[in-house]
Amino acid sequence: MHRAMYLRPKVVRIALAAGLLSSLTGAAKVKMDPANPTCPLTPDWSANTTMQLTPVVKGGAKVLLAEGRIDAGLPDRLKAALAANPDVGEVWLRSPGGDARAGNAAGRIIRSNFGLTTRIPAGWACFSACNFIFMGGQPRVIDPGGLFIVHMFTRTGDRSTIDMSVAMGTEATRELIGDIEQDAALLASEDNDFLIRMGVSRKLLTEVMYQQKALENADDKSTRRCLTQTEVKSYNVANNNE
């Protein structure tokens, strides 16, 4: 409760800073992706090979910029960064995803810091495992022009592993399929539990995430979806009133 009371006066200033970023980044016309028509061709989800956590001051208040790929070590780094910066009011996210379970763990760490807001600023993209870090926030803000991008979580994208199992013969392929099915079922259960705990509608999984194809094919190359402002609010992904 102490964190929530301390941060409340800062929310307006941070929102103004995010709004300024929105006006600066939203001016250029965005080229859309023909394969994924709801999304831009080149989402700005950072090229950092591991997520960098940088405390900065925006609008007179401290925020934590979380930018880059999610790796297994992120939860520990995030916990340390928040402990070292107890006056951080918001976490701003852009990421191409990465380790799904590390994303879930990082989201739970954010939720354990009561009153810590997560934000996807205009022009920034939060994809795949980044979704679950974002959903740990309370409240959660997606600025107009910010991108919450989903896909079907899968291990079938590891083509080298699949090719190797096929080369080894039928039994190896059967074992790989069994491993994939087991891991997919476990991850789906974990994701479902996570959404319940974070207050996000489980329909986000059934109506959006699980409706995306795991792999593109000759007829339809779409594998990801960018949610609209209406959708992120209807599924309670964003739960602010800004």
Segments predicted by a language model, with ranges:
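Bacterial N-terminal signal peptides that target proteins for export
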Residues: 2-14
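Bacterial N-terminal signal peptides
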Residues: 13-23
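Bacterial Sec-dependent signal peptides at the C-terminal "C-region" and cleavage site
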Residues: 24-33
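STAS-typified acidic loop motif
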Residues: 38, 47-77
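Extracytoplasmic/secreted envelope proteins and their assembly/folding machinery
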Residues: 75-79, 103-107, 130-131, 135, ...
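Short, glycine-/small-residue-enriched flexible loop/hinge segments at domain edges that mediate gating
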Residues: 87-102, 117-123
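Glycine-rich beta-to-alpha active-site loop
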Residues: 115-157, 161
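Charged, glycine-interspersed solvent-exposed loop segments at helix/strand-loop junctions
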Residues: 160-242
